[in-house]
Amino acid sequence: DDVHPEVAYIAQLAAKVVGLDIAGIDMVARDISKPLHTQGGAIVEVNAGPGLLMHLKPAVGAPRPVGQAIAEHLFPSDADDEGPAGRIPLVGVAGTRNTATISRVVAWLLHLSGHHTGLACRDGLFLDRRLVEATDCAHWEAAHRLLMNKMVQAAVIESDARTILRDGLAYDRCQVGVVTDMDGVETLAEFDVHEQDQMTKVMRTQVDVVLAEGAAVLNAAIPQVADLAPLSDGDVVLYAQDGTLPVIAEHRAKDNGRAVFVKNGRVVLATGSAEHVLGT
């Protein structure tokens, strides 16, 4: 409370000049409530790894919540519209039917939008157009490596029922969650999954993590997948080759629901009764 505004500004400037987001600034001064130049004061050290104990449990004065301040500075909340929520755009793709192809197409579209995009799928681990690892990377370890990479600005991660049961998802929430199918129950006996109905509890994981401002993209041609729609915290987009499916018609009629389907050989995005041909 006693720090002079000019002293605080000089400390911030010193950290910026060195290129640090968080720094400890050691100063020599007779009175911290006065500008340094009026008392011959100076900065003697810029510390990249400052200790917090002296602020949390000071010998003199009130404790300061520096840990909370650091976290809020590095990962600002979007609740007050002052910055991003500390998340990158993330698309999760779950299933077995052409999921690698879907993941690669989505990653390519994100790349074209200007994001440095990471992709973990059955075809390998990719950073933008570069193949980093040419093995099956549709698993937790590869996805975690991707999310730890500071250069990645958007990510697409493929999963299936086996990886979800074995490891879970590598992320807590996603902007878009795609579920293509619920195949493969015959391979999951080791996880005590024997019946097709049990697949709902497994594959709903991908829908459960969709953010409120995000969307679940579900295959309307498979009733068990389409039935996951009420579980999404965000919007729901249904897709199928046949746009006349009853589930799509019902979804479009309810709250202007969105759906993607093929009509007269063209891909159509429908919002309620309105239809827009994509690619035109």
Locations of the language-model features?
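Protein kinase-like catalytic core scaffold
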Residues: 42-44, 155, 178, 216
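Residue-level signal for inorganic ion chemistry
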Residues: 26, 120, 158, 217
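Acidic, Mg2+-coordinating active-site environments of NTP-dependent enzymes
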Residues: 87, 166-172, 176-280
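Walker A (P-loop) phosphate-binding motif
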Residues: 78-131
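ATP-dependent carboxylate activation and anion-phosphoryl transfer catalytic cores
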Residues: 1-92
